[in-house]
């Protein structure tokens, strides 16, 4: 279900009164007054004799002047009402844009793709000659397929980002993996101590097989000052999905601003899509998270998003987006079938791509049975914000 947004009431400004028409009416009133004066003075109409000649002669002009002032007052009130409603609508739109523009700051990110493909090459469109995996791929070295070694690779990939984190802020770890066992947390702690000796884990550690992309929305609603590491590790897909390894260090915008944390990218508030109403939802999304209209490209995690590209392009026409259907890219092309962590894998890839391309991109994410859309933008490393 998409965002429930009630738009402010507005009104069309009617056409302004015709000044020429009112001048003509004033002329007619003046002529009528002159005729009444002549009729009264000549005693041609005895019934007019009971009236004061000057009041009688001036009454058409006075009546016209009264109606002219009344029409001007009514028009002024209509204009004032229109301006008030317009300002209210603009203010409401600004508030919605601020709400939709809240983000999780990406303090560090990495993703391991097969065959030497890098996010840098994808961002620069240099990955066209790389092998395309639209099925399954097992790309981890057989010697490094233990959970301990893969945990070490994931932690080492964000080593520079971890080193810059303030020690006073709680650091939570969420491991999304298909290799979880009873001693998995112990192995993680051992890998952590090996790579980050002397740096204590100050927050919680949780392990799960899937993490909904709706976690971002919940994280933005939660006013807790902490930092989260999300580690995606897939190596047991067999015939269902491909290997994957990615890491994201995230925190909410208020934490990034309070501690002036440099960040490479921003994941803006995602919108849960109602797929039967996909076109309408995309229109609402583009009206609300307006920076999405400036995105240079569109990326999705699974190839099944192809079925919705026509509706996507139709919804975007009125918003003048620069998207071209042929340039919509798919994570599955580079990594094979993404699996349960597809949304987070795409988020990690787009964070890297945004850092390289320095332009916002639109992401279409699959998380279980849910579908999301969000904008990934440059972070404080590329602009004055944050």
Model-derived features: positions:
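Conserved "HGTGT" condensation-loop signature of ketosynthase/thiolase-family condensing enzymes
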Residues: 1-225, 234-239, 246-386
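A short, small-residue-rich loop immediately preceding and capping a beta-strand
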Residues: 229-231
